[in-house]
Amino acid sequence: MPWVQITLSATPENSEVLEDMLLLCGAGAVSLLDGADQPVFEPIKGTTPLWQDTRVMGLFEADTDADALLEYLSNGWQAAFPSLHFPSYKLEILEDKDWERQWMDRFEPIQFGARLWVCPSWKPVPDPTAVNLMLDPGLAFGTGSHPTTALCLQWIAEQDWQHKTVIDYGCGSGILAIAAVLMGADQVMGVDNDTQALTATIDNAQRNGIAVTTIPVCLPEDTPNKAVDVMLANILAGPLIDMAERLSELTKPAGLIALSGILQHQADAVIAAYEPWFNMHTVVSKDEWVRIDGIRHS
C-alpha cells in the first residue's frame, strides 16, 4: 500500500517533541536520520543517538489528510517552541513497500544497568534470565532511544523497587511504569493528558503480562490524591516547573523523585522550583539532556 511520508529538520533539543507529535497524529513509524541518511532506532550502548543536524521522518497511511497533519504539527510546535519558526519539511507519497516492516526489523534491544533490557516484541531476548521489557514501538511514545528516556531507565535499573508505589507522570508508552513494575514495584499509576498514550500504556503493560490493576492509568485531572513512594516525570522543563507543588503533594515524605525532559541550561530553574519540597541532590547528563533526582523532605 502507498504511504504519506513527512520529513522534518530537527536538532537534538527538539527532535523528541517532533517524534511525539508525529506518533500522536497516528504515524505508523517514526525514524531519525543524519545527513548520511543512516537511521537510528536504538543506539548501541555508549554511542550518541542523535546528530546536531537530525531529520525526523514519519510514515502515515495514504488517506492521511496532509493539511490537517501540517496544521497539527505547526500548532504543537508553536506551543512547545514559541520563539522558533516551524522547521522545514518535505511531504512525499511512497509507493507500495513495507516501510514499517523494514523499520521494525532494525529496532534492536538495549540494556540499562545490569539487569534491565528493553526489547522489541518480535525479536528474541538477548538474556532470558534478565528483566526483559517487551515493547511494540508502533504503540509507543518512548522506546528507550531518546536520552531522557534512557536516563530514567538507567535510574530505574539502579533502585530497590520492592513494596514501592509509583506515579509515572507523562507516561507516554508506559515504558517507565512497566520497567518499575518488572523491577519489583507493587503498583504504578500512569498519568498522561493524552488518551492515546493511556491506551499505549495499557497495551504495552498487557504485552508484558501486567494486569491493569497493577498499572492503572488516568488523565491528570483524575489522579487520586494519594501520595506514593516514587515519582517519575519525564516531560519538559516548563510543565515540570509549573507542576512542582502538585508533584510534591503526590510524593510521600522521604519519597524519591526523578525528573527528566530537561535541557542542561534548564536544570537550575527546575531544581529551584522543587527545592521547597525536595532535596534535589543529583544531576546526571546525557548529550544535552539531564535527569534530576531528589528526596522529599520528611
Regions found by a protein language model. Give the residues of each.
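Short, flexible coil/linker segments at domain boundaries that flank nucleotide/cofactor-interacting
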Residues: 1, 84, 161-162, 183, ...
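N-terminal auxiliary segments of SAM/dcSAM-dependent transferases
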Residues: 2-127
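A short, charged helix-loop
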Residues: 131-137
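S-adenosylmethionine
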Residues: 159, 191-298
